[in-house]
């Protein structure tokens, strides 16, 4: 197990190195803005129809202990949850093929780049914990001793309290208990968590299933299966369909030949198939079966099915074959993880810079103002103000983060500055005459708190920028040329040194105060 600890350490180093410093992402803002208060709704309110009690509790504790300005702690919580899933996978595989063959399998999952949407994003603690609970319940069934019912109940409680995957986890575990002829011994361990979830559903539950998705289920299930198989080595989807059918045939042969020995195959196949069916019924209209968050849930199950096939040969051969597979998987999906990390950093840079501006202008921002409806659609100025005041911390970038922010992020900050009135440009009543030889072209520096009147020598496009390198479309204005324009810059952040640029070819202007 020392080797596994070293592998986990290397994985942590890689995740931290490629993730860098960023802030909360997309759905996480729903938790930040709506679940920071200590009230029952913060924990029991569903998220996209999922019971999210456990992830909401984890985020709440972190909100209250480390605040909103230490996102690295949230990332660490996500890594630990992912490592728990990988370790449980290792333990289950060890019981079938031994440690030498199990290590490559667990490592392949640990570093699976095509599932980075979960492993690198703390919000997916819910999905990962739900899967971990299922694997813990399977571990309890494998032990099958006097402590197993309690361990199984804990696993199912964790799974149900974390995400919707817990529903199929309960069904899969119940199926295996029945196939093992141990249904009576495990009945309470299954029924108690299921009953608690049902009581929650009666009060808070919602369903996103749509009748029109019924006809889409077969195709969605087929593509989800093939896509998950292909994602293990980042192969084209067409090859995924071929290999998926070959794997299915091999598993059927194994079950037919040794039905009692391969009961786990039935459990795993039924569980993931049920998950894909339920996902199709509720999400097929969005058609994202190849998304990394779905691949993540399927990958350990597919790897355990592969382990079942490997158990048919001697352990030395199994270890060699699985080592080759793991090397293929890690190397082929390595860049996919790096690419997803870059995307997360880019989005985080933009939101962090936008919030830096919003923090400085909350006193003038309308309550319904949204700085970024794409990357952070849940952020409204009033709810954001309440959260940072209530938690006495802000997720906005500090000076160091602002300095290191990308070009695109700084441009997004300019947009928010402009939308919140940091600079205004309007028709002026004052008269100004451009005397020949007094016009200027190019770029003019406008310091904080300044005001000037300008007149272009003809119709021209004016661009404004402060933190960005180029003016955004939102900060471009058409000057008529026959009327003066007044430009006013208010005084807020010291780095807001606005620049006025004449963007039209051969455009010139003269200025007055």
Residues of each region from the PLM?
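Membrane-interface alpha helices of multi-pass inner-membrane proteins
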Residues: 148-164, 169-176
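Intrinsically disordered, polar/acidic, low-complexity terminal segments
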Residues: 3-50, 59, 63-105, 175-177, ...
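Transmembrane-helix signature of polytopic, lipid-linked glycan biosynthesis machinery
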Residues: 13-15, 114-120, 160, 198-203, ...
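Transmembrane alpha-helix segments characteristic
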Residues: 104-105, 195, 259-283, 325-326
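Hydrophobic/aromatic-rich transmembrane helices and adjacent perimembrane loops
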Residues: 119, 127, 287-311
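Hydrophobic core segments of transmembrane alpha-helices in multi-pass, intramembrane catalytic enzymes
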Residues: 30, 34, 82, 127-137, ...
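Membrane-interface transmembrane helices that cradle and orient dolichyl/undecaprenyl
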Residues: 134-150
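Aromatic- and kink-enriched transmembrane "portal" helix at the membrane-lumen/periplasm boundary
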Residues: 53, 71, 75, 103-131
């Amino acid at each position: 197990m020392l080797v596994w600890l070293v592998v986990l350490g290397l994985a942590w180093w890689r995740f931290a190195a490629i993730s860098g410093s960023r802030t909360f992402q997309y759905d996480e803002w729903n938790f930040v803005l709506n679940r920071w208060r200590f009230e029952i709704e913060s924990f029991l309110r569903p998220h996209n129809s999922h019971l999210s009690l456990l992830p909401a509790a984890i985020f709440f504790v972190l909100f209250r202990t480390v605040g909103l300005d230490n996102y690295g702690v949230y990332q660490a919580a996500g890594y630990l949850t992912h490592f728990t899933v990988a370790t449980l996978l290792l333990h289950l595989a060890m019981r079938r093929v031994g440690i030498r063959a199990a290590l490559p399998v667990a490592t392949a999952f640990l570093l699976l780049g095509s599932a980075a949407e979960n492993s690198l994003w703390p919000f997916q603690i819910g999905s990962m914990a739900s899967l971990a609970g299922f694997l813990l319940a399977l571990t309890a069934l494998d032990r099958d001793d006097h402590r197993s019912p309690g361990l199984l109940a804990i696993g199912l409680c964790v799974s149900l309290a974390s995400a919707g995957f817990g529903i199929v986890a309960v069904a899969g575990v119940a199926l295996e208990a029945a196939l093992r002829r141990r249904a009576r011994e495990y009945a309470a361990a299954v029924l108690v968590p299921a009953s608690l979830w049902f009581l929650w559903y009666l009060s808070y539950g919602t369903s996103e299933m749509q009748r029109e998705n019924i006809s889409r289920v077969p195709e969605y299930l087929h593509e989800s299966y093939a896509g998950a198989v292909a994602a293990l080595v980042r192969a084209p989807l067409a090859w995924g369909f071929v290999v998926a059918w070959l794997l299915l045939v091999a598993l059927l042969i194994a079950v037919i030949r040794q039905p009692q020995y391969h009961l786990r195959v039935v459990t795993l196949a039924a569980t993931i198939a049920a998950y894909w069916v339920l996902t199709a019924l509720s999400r097929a209209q969005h058609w994202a079966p190849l998304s990394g968050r779905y691949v993540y849930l399927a990958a350990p199950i597919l790897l355990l099915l592969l382990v079942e096939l490997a158990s048919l040969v001697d352990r030395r051969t199994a270890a060699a074959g699985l080592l080759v597979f793991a090397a293929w998987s890690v190397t082929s999906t390595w860049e996919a993880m790096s690419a997803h990390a870059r995307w997360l950093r880019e989005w985080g840079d933009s939101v962090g810079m936008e919030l830096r501006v919003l923090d400085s202008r909350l006193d003038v921002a309308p309550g319904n103002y949204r700085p970024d409806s794409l990357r952070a659609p849940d952020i409204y100025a009033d709810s954001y103000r309440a959260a940072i005041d209530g938690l006495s911390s802000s997720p906005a970038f500090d000076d160091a983060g602002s300095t290191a922010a990308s070009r695109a992020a700084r441009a997004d900050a300019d947009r928010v500055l402009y939308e919140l009135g940091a600079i205004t440009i309007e028709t002026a009543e004052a008269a100004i005459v451009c005397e020949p030889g007094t016009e200027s072209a190019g770029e003019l520096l406008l310091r904080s708190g300044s005001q000037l009147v300008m007149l272009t020598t003809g119709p021209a496009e004016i661009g404004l920028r402060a933190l960005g390198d180029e003016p955004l479309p939102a900060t471009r204005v058409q000057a008529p040329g026959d009327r003066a324009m007044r430009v006013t810059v208010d005084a807020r952040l010291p780095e807001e040194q606005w620049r006025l640029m004449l963007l039209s070819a051969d455009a010139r202007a003269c200025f007055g105060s």
